């Protein structure tokens, strides 16, 4: 019998890739989306998925029957000057409603896409941390398995252009005159979207073999490089003429200077990162070059 998975954030970068992978592995895919969301990332699979409006959570479970797993990837970063209350509504209130409805409908597992950022860095990271605590609360009472997936820095083609990696790649491809940057000493664990998807598929394969009510997995390569090295590598691979001005921007208050995944738990399930940094980055650049 086909496993049935509900995805939030299906129109986003991570969610759309997940949906395509799930269909390729013969999962039945259901999804919640905002009424105004662009469907451009899922046009090729629109007839193969079951789409519901984000306001129809309760009716979704009544109409579609048993859902085995919820994969929650929808989020609000606050990049578009949203009010703090709007960020908290998107990152706490909405997934909490989903937890409650899913629990009532007998959903067995909730996979939560989480951040590695310091919880006090900004409203986004604080809201994600507070929802994590609510997820633990649910799992402690054996209401639903809550698996927290802490994602390092994901990159790949067709990402949100406002994200740092996409902005740097597109700026270098377009040869803008100057790219203003911090000193770039902070280190990040950059992982290609294909490896993130393979991690999720690994977790789904093991979901019935682990009895943990709460468990946390870190998804990354396990290695970090500096922001400066990332930018300079993009600059070299694109043969860009853009002037890189490191140190022209200040660090954010509370900036994380070192971040990399501890992949021990994932590797114990048989997962391994397959893409090396420069090869995956060059693949991303070449795919983005076509879009310019």
Show where each model-derived region lies.
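SDR active-site strand-loop-helix element
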Residues: 8, 32, 73-74, 110-115, ...
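Conserved Rossmann-fold NAD(P)-dependent oxidoreductase catalytic core, especially the SDR/UDP-sugar
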Residues: 72, 76, 89, 93-126
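Short, conserved SAM-binding/catalytic segment
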Residues: 38-49
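NAD(P)H-binding glycine-rich loop region in Rossmannoid oxidoreductase-like domains
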Residues: 53-90, 101
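Conserved glycine-rich Rossmann-like NAD(P)H-binding loop of the short-chain dehydrogenase/reductase
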Residues: 27-37
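NAD(P)-dependent short-chain dehydrogenase/reductase
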Residues: 123-125, 129, 133-188, 193-204, ...
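C-terminal substrate-binding subdomain of Rossmann-fold SDR/epimerase-dehydratase oxidoreductases
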Residues: 176, 180-292
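N-terminal Rossmann NAD(P)H-binding glycine-rich loop of SDR-like oxidoreductase domains
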Residues: 5-25
């Amino acid at each position: 019998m086909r496993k049935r998975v509900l995805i939030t954030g299906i129109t986003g970068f991570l969610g759309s890739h997940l949906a395509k992978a799930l269909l390729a592995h013969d999962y039945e895919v259901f999804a919640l989306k905002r009424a105004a969301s662009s469907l451009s990332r899922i046009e090729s699979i629109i007839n193969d998925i079951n789409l519901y409006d984000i306001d129809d959570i309760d009716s979704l479970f009544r109409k579609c029957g048993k859902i085995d797993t919820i994969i929650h990837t929808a989020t609000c970063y606050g990049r578009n000057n949203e009010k703090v209350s709007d960020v908290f509504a998107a990152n706490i209130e909405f997934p909490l409603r989903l937890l409650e409805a899913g629990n009532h409908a007998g959903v067995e597992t909730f996979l939560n896409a989480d951040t590695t950022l310091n919880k006090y860095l900004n409203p986004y990271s604080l809201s994600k941390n507070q929802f994590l605590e609510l997820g633990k609360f649910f799992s402690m009472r054996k209401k639903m398995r809550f698996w927290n997936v802490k994602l390092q820095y994901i990159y790949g083609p067709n990402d949100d252009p406002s994200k740092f990696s996409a902005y740097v790649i597109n700026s270098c491809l377009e040869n803008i005159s100057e790219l203003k940057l911090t000193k770039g000493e902070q280190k990040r664990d950059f992982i290609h979207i294909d490896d993130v998807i393979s991690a999720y598929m690994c977790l789904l394969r093991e979901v019935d073999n682990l009895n943990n009510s709460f468990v946390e997995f870190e998804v990354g390569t396990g290695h970090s490089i500096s922001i400066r090295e990332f930018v300079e590598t993009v600059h070299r691979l694109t043969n860009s003429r853009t002037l890189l001005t490191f140190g022209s921007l200040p660090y954010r208050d509370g900036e994380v200077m070192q971040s990399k995944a501890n992949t021990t738990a994932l590797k114990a399930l048989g997962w391994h990162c397959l893409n090396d940094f420069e090869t995956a980055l060059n693949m991303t650049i070449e795919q983005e070059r076509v879009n310019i």
